[in-house]
A protein has these predicted regions:
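Hydrophobic faces of well-ordered beta-strands that scaffold small-molecule active sites
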Residues: 3-7, 49-51, 71-76, 108-110, ...
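Conserved radical SAM core fold
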Residues: 10-12, 77-82, 114-117, 204-210
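Gly/Pro-rich active-site loop or hairpin
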Residues: 17-31, 86, 163, 179-235, ...
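Generic structural signal for well-ordered alpha-helices
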Residues: 34-38, 57-62, 93-98, 129-136, ...
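Structural motif
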Residues: 43-44, 102-103, 196, 232
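Acidic-and-aromatic substrate-binding clefts and catalytic sites of carbohydrate-active enzymes
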Residues: 48-60, 79-89, 116-120, 152-157, ...
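Active-site acidic/histidine proton-transfer and metal-coordination neighborhood
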Residues: 66, 81-173, 182, 250
């Protein structure tokens, strides 16, 4: 298994400001100096990095190679359930896939499925499933492996909602252990249940108060998850993510790498 890091540890995430008036330009973006962040991830000892689509828009040719990093994945997302804007959203995801291909990414990860003011309907899940199939096709056209990332504050947070969407789409599964645990899921059980759909994973820890913390400081059973991955002969990327953390991101990145290496033995 290879170990990467999500660049949002240094700056979090915002939507690109142009997207306020142009859905097709509503890229995710970690503010700040992406090249500096790449240097910090490399200095911590990681092999790869995951970047938001908006950071790839700004990335200079050769930046990854200069730091000795592989692009494990590019992360994008959309509402997916509003038919009138879906073509604009898919245009943006196609752009993310093009950028991912250009910079040598292996995976296209998408989150989303908008929460309405009313509970999600079966039609919402049908629309989400069909849109994710289109995302999968876009990714594959560009040589990327497509996965869906459940996330708090979307219509797919926990186990019951996972069943709803995965019954309606062929896209792969990128589990985010912190988000799944925060939504009431058992990450170990979910790894075993969906083992044949998982080509990529986010290692993220969370407290009972839903604060994201360095690995091993929260509620996630990482030893159990890693055992489930081994049982499934998983040999892909483990991407560590730690956003919204008040501590030193550089020290946390080093500690997280040591923690994962300890799990892998």
């Amino acid at each position: 298994m290879r170990i990467g890091y999500q660049a949002n540890a240094w700056g979090g995430v915002v939507g690109h400001p142009v997207g306020v008036t142009s859905i097709k330009d509503l890229f995710y973006l970690t503010p700040g100096d992406t090249d500096d962040t790449l240097g910090r991830i490399a200095a911590a000892g990681y092999e790869g990095v995951e970047l938001f689509d908006g950071n790839l828009v700004e990335l200079a040719d050769g930046a990854l190679e200069a730091h000795g990093l592989a692009l494990a994945g590019v992360y994008s997302g959309a509402n997916f359930v509003f038919p009138d804007v879906l073509p604009e959203e898919l245009w943006r995801i196609r752009r993310a896939a093009e950028l991912g291909q250009r910079f040598g990414a292996e995976h296209l990860v998408v989150g989303g499925g908008a929460q309405r003011t009313e509970p999600a309907t079966l039609e919402d899940y049908e629309r989400l499933g069909k849109a994710l199939d289109e995302v999968a096709s876009i990714a594959e056209e560009h040589g990327l492996t497509p996965t869906y990332h459940p996330h708090l504050s979307t219509i797919v947070e926990g186990p019951d909602q996972l069943e709803q969407v995965f019954a309606r789409t062929r896209i792969g599964f990128c589990p985010d252990l912190g988000h799944l645990a925060a939504a009431g899921g058992d990450p170990v059980e979910l790894m075993r249940r969906y083992a044949d759909r998982i080509p990529y994973i986010h290692y993220k820890d969370v407290t009972e108060e839903v604060a994201f913390v360095p690995l091993g400081q929260g509620t996630v059973d990482f030893a159990g998850v890693t055992g489930a991955l081994r049982d499934a002969a998983y040999d892909g990327w483990i991407v560590v993510e730690l956003d919204g953390y008040d501590g030193d991101p550089d020290a946390a990145a080093r500690d997280n790498l040591s923690y994962v290496r300890g799990l892998l033995g």
